Amino acid sequence: MTRIAFAVALAVAALLRLDDALAQAAFPPPPPKVSPAAGVIDMHVHSHPDVFGRNMDDLDVAQLAKARGMRGIVLKNHISETASRAALVMKVVPGIEVFGGIVLNTAVGGINPSAVEWMHRIYGGRGKVVWLPTFESDKHVKTFTGPNAKGLTVAPNGQVTPEMEAILQIVARENLVLATGHVHPEEVVAVVRRGRELGVKNMLVTHGFTSVPGLNMAQAKEVADMGALIEVCFLQFLAGPNAPLPFLTHWTQINAKHVAQAAKEIGAKSLLISSDLGQSANMTHPDGIEAAVGQLKKEGIADADIETMLRKNPARMLGLDG
């Protein structure tokens, strides 16, 4: 190549680079995609170690949630406390809030104030949520086993038991979150009422509209008026006769249409959406959150209401905003 030809080639290359720069300025590339799960706090996360099949362990969940921009997760286990696990995960996966708690099934002594007292004292201060009995509650075993089955109760005849009273006092004193588990809807109302009287600030009705506890709208309005939030879990979007997982075929489906109706009747300010995911062969927690957001938007629920249900309400319950 002659010197003249080489100079022409350089000039052409420079012009091409200039054209490319001008094009980039006129038509800049789109901004990086932001996950619909960004900033969300999932207050209902199942993971290994567990006695039930799970698709990820605590570290996997935290790392994936962080990578998708989520603000935090709450680890839930039906048979053991998760405050200690949350504290360790926080050390290994910085940059995401991880909390735990305790579910009051028989493995921890049932309705056991001592278990709650020790849980919230565990090193790291990550023990935040106290769930009432789940698969061993009287409501759960009667619903899925039969009417003659008997399980744990917290407020027979509409009055909380002495043990339940003591637990509410601890929750109020330590500013924990009281989640109602799978107890009877009448027990939910009684516990929320007594909790309010004792000064419990943060009460969450665990997946309130599905099979357990199965609140009707009047009961939902009653507890919402007393300051409780009602949880809706994406897992229940997947439930019903055509559910992808066999155990979900026995649960009542609660989907985005139900959320839209509840938001109209009691307000998004009284609702909280989480995943309740982690089961073997099920989708990941962030995928579930993203799917939930998509379905809520498709149903016409306002972005501001989605922000309230998935970000603001969980943050307030966990003491992350003020």
Feature roles, as predicted:
Residues P286-G322:
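Mid-to-C-terminal alpha-helical segments outside catalytic/metal-binding sites
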Residues C233, A268-H285:
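Short acidic/histidine-rich active-site segments
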Residues H48-D50, S80-S84, N105-V108, S137-H140, ...:
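Active-site environment of divalent metal-dependent phosphoester hydrolases
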Residues M43-F52, F135-S137, K142-Q159:
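Glycine-rich phosphate-binding "P-loop"
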Residues F27, D58-Q63, A83-L88, P94, ...:
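Histidine/acidic residue-rich metal-binding segments in metalloenzymes
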Residues A25-I96:
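An N-terminally biased module of ancient metal coordination in phosphate/nucleic-acid-related enzymes
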Residues A5-D20:
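Bacterial N-terminal signal peptides
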Residues I41-V45, I73-L75, F99-I102, V130-L132, ...:
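Hydrophobic faces of well-ordered beta-strands that scaffold small-molecule active sites
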